[in-house]
């Protein structure tokens, strides 16, 4: 339906949005039917341009700092009005969507976009409900105006673009940005603030279920394997990135997937490969002269993406929900080549490694990254998205693990035999074999060896995995150099963890520097 006065298209279909995007020059059609769009210079998130309005209702509960930058309420009001005025005579696309598959914990949101492909992205990634807002909750508003240019002197922003969350007014403003991932991560941040007050743990994780209804969670930063490992032909997908864990079950916060495409292959990632078809948005993917996507081409960015609805996946959990998880996997991408491919964690170790969030930034998911791969400690495996203090989420995780009896594992999808540039990265089949052993229950009560410096218990055998890979010192030619690197990593853990106020049991669960 279109409004003839200022051309507003309400709840447009996928076909309509693809048509609009092509007619308006926003993108091109690929040979596999997907829509390719380019985001320009900002091909990843812009954390330096993300703000939260500092206002009385939420001020005391937010951990203010470089991640959650404060924005003045009056400045927000002025900027919101300027963006609305800018869009007043533009053709717009509007949908009423929801965030959160749980009937109690959803948030209704009206998404208004200047670009057709941004609206298609929103309809792919958020939930299109059969009946909008059945509990009549107050509705959130997202406005996305990529062609609006912010003026820092006038608007109070840090640059010509911004992302601002306003919890009191239930508004999200995106201006000057074409990278569509900002939309989904904004509403993830909203749920990350709201859910803990309802006793629900919001998680930066993927989730799937087996034929017997057993749920597995995969925590990790972008590029560490959440989407790839949860898209398992033998299991049913709940979701690939954002979930809530409530007493009694797990639910997807989204209605779609946002998969990294760099080096995508049909052999290694058949579920994702098959999901890329008409209706999918490909971000910054390069095509050849026949419009065939070249997933190896990183000339625009390493952070190439595919955004598709869950309906594009044959083996999925149709209600986007699952039982509480028997297995919880923390995915770490270790660039030092020190960590084992799999470790079995106690609940105290789970809390330690959840708070630490040791991993790597893979494939420049943020603009301004100095290199494609660098080690980092990202609290809760998603520090950029969690507005409350880290302890709030860690306490909820401990509570859920203890209550249900979930077993937590640390899985390294990074390097072995040496650091990045010297060693080699664990291949996907090896990691899949480890995950298969985890979800089958094979690793419960198995014989382990203890790595003293890392303070980790490692199984001595895993079906389908070369046993020499399990203890990382075996893969290094220079054993003394491995010991040196392991000590350095333990020291980095200890230094990073010093900022947390936790029990001795949790502090002592980490590596021994």
Swiss-Prot record:
Binding-site list for substrate: 45, 179, 185, 305
Quaternary structure (record): Monomer.
UniProt GO cellular component terms: cytosol
Annotated compartments: Cytoplasm
Recorded family membership: Belongs to the phosphoenolpyruvate carboxykinase (ATP) family.
Involved pathway(s): Carbohydrate biosynthesis; gluconeogenesis
Source species of the chain: Shewanella baltica (strain OS155 / ATCC BAA-1091)
The protein's name in its UniProt record: Phosphoenolpyruvate carboxykinase (ATP)
Gene name in the database record: pckA
Broad class of the protein's primary localization: cytoplasm
């Amino acid at each position: 339906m279109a409004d003839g006065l200022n051309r507003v298209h309400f709840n447009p279909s996928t076909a309509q949005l693809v048509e609009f995007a092509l007619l308006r020059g926003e993108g091109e059609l690929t040979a596999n039917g997907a829509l390719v769009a380019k985001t320009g210079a900002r091909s990843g998130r812009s954390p330096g341009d993300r703000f939260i309005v500092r206002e009385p209702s939420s001020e005391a509960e937010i951990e203010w700092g470089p991640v959650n930058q404060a924005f003045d309420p009056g400045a927000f009001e002025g900027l919101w009005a300027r963006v609305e005025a800018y869009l007043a005579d533009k053709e717009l696309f509007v949908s009423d969507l929801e965030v959160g598959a749980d009937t109690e914990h959803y948030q209704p949101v009206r998404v208004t976009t200047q670009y057709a492909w941004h609206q298609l992205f929103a309809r792919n990634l958020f939930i299109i409900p059969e009946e909008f807002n059945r509990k009549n909750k107050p509705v959130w508003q997202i406005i996305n105006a990529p062609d609006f240019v912010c003026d820092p002197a006038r608007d109070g922003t840090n640059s010509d673009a911004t992302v601002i969350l306003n919890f009191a007014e239930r508004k999200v403003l995106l201006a000057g940005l074409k990278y569509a991932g900002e939309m989904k991560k904004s509403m993830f941040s909203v749920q990350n603030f709201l859910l803990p007050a309802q006793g629900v743990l919001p998680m930066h994780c993927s989730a799937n279920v087996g034929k017997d209804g057993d749920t597995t969670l995969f925590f990790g930063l972008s590029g560490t394997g959440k989407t790839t490992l949860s898209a398992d032909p033998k299991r049913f997908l709940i979701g690939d990135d954002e979930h809530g864990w409530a007493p009694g079950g797990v639910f997807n916060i989204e209605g779609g997937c946002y998969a990294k495409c760099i080096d995508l292959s049909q052999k290694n990632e058949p579920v994702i490969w098959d999901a890329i078809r008409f209706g999918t948005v490909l971000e910054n993917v390069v095509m050849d002269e026949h419009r065939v996507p070249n997933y190896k081409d990183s000339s625009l960015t390493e952070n190439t993406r595919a955004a598709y609805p869950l309906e594009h996946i044959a083996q999925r959990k149709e209600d986007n929900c699952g039982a509480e998880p028997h297995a919880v996997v923390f995915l770490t991408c270790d660039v030092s080549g020190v960590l084992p491919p799999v470790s079995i964690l106690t609940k105290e170790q789970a809390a330690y490694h959840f708070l630490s969030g040791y991993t790597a930034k893979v494939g420049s998911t943020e603009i301004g990254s100095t290199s494609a791969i660098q080690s980092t400690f990202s609290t809760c495996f998603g520090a950029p998205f969690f507005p409350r203090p880290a302890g709030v989420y860690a306490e909820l995780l401990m509570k859920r693990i203890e209550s249900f009896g979930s077993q937590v594992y640390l899985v390294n999808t990074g390097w072995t035999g040496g650091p990045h540039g010297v060693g080699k990265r664990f291949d996907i089949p090896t990691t899949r074999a480890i995950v298969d052993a985890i979800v089958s229950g094979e690793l419960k009560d198995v014989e382990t060896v203890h790595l003293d410096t890392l303070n980790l218990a490692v199984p001595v055998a895993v079906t389908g995995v070369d046993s020499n890979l399990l203890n990382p010192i075996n893969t290094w030619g220079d054993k003394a150099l491995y010991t040196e690197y392991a000590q350095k990593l333990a020291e980095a853990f200890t230094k990073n963890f010093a900022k947390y106020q936790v029990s001795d049991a949790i502090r002592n669960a980490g590596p021994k520097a």
